[in-house]
Amino acid sequence: MAAAAAARAAPVELSESDFAVAINNHSFALGERWSEQTRTQAGTQISESFVGDVPAGETSYKYYQHRYAGFDIYTANLSWQKQQRDIDSYIIAQITINVPAIRTARGIAIGDTQNVLIDTYGQGTTDDSDGQHWRSYETKNKRLSFQLEHGRIIHIMMTLDTDS
């Protein structure tokens, strides 16, 4: 019994593949370039809207929300100067999942229990602010977060830090 509890508490090392999801038989990953082709591969877009400029140090980055049935993809012109890209070139900065049909790289989906999440990813860190319960896992400049309600996952979010 103690060995099982210790195994559940052990942190799990995340890899780049943990920050990608398969949607419509195509992979979408944080930091990937956003193009007309990736927009089309995601399916029928419900809406696109400018979210705003997000300050980061001496500069700010533009964010757009691309809404699809069951998920959203946020794009930003993050690090365009550092990577010597055009100011109007965008990368995937956030992916939010709201339906059980889209699973994480390790198979976790909306509706799964907190116990299944912990068995798969470890304890992670918790945040109970604003009346919400989140469990998150981070590596370098990326975060994978799960919102839980009544012990079940109701929302999955992958984010890329603005400093990346």
Feature locations, PLM:
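Second-shell loop/turn segments in exported
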Residues: 23-28, 100-108
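A cross-family detector of function-defining hotspots
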Residues: 9, 34-84, 108-152, 158-164
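N-terminal low-complexity, Pro/Thr/Ser-rich intrinsically disordered segments
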Residues: 2-35
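A short, hydrophobic secondary-structure junction motif
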Residues: 70-73, 98-102
